């Protein structure tokens, strides 16, 4: 039995070493500058503020309600809500960017953010 390299020419084989496993669809290249700035901001919050506290919460079986207030103050609980009602007034791509960055750290907080 032949393997794929015997049937497919070298030029047609995918170069998996250059494949971006963190962004397989080159999603980041399709974002506007504002969406990229939002992504960086939320990623910073998720990595620097959320992740250490979640690790502690898992270890001690606790929850910190102030995290919800902080997320609300940043507008993460109302990304698509108009600014006059306290939201960010952004579109659904921005909402997806926010959800993805929170999800990278914890799916529970992403779920809470989505259904609040």
Per-segment meaning from a language model:
Residues 11, 20-22, 26, 58, ...:
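Residue-level signal for pocket-adjacent positions within structured domains
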Residues 52-73:
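Short secondary-structure junction/hinge motifs that connect adjacent elements
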């Amino acid at each position: 039995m032949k393997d794929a390299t015997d049937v497919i020419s070298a030029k047609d084989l995918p170069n998996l070493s250059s494949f971006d496993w963190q962004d397989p669809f080159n999603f980041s290249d399709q974002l506007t500058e504002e969406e990229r700035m939002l992504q960086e901001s939320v990623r910073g919050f998720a990595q620097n503020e959320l992740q250490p506290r979640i690790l502690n919460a898992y270890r001690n079986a606790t929850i910190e309600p102030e995290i919800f207030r902080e997320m609300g103050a940043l507008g993460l609980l109302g990304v698509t809500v108009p600014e006059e009602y306290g939201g960010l007034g952004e579109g659904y791509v921005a909402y997806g960017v926010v959800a993805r960055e929170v999800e990278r750290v914890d799916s529970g907080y992403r779920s809470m953010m989505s259904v609040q």
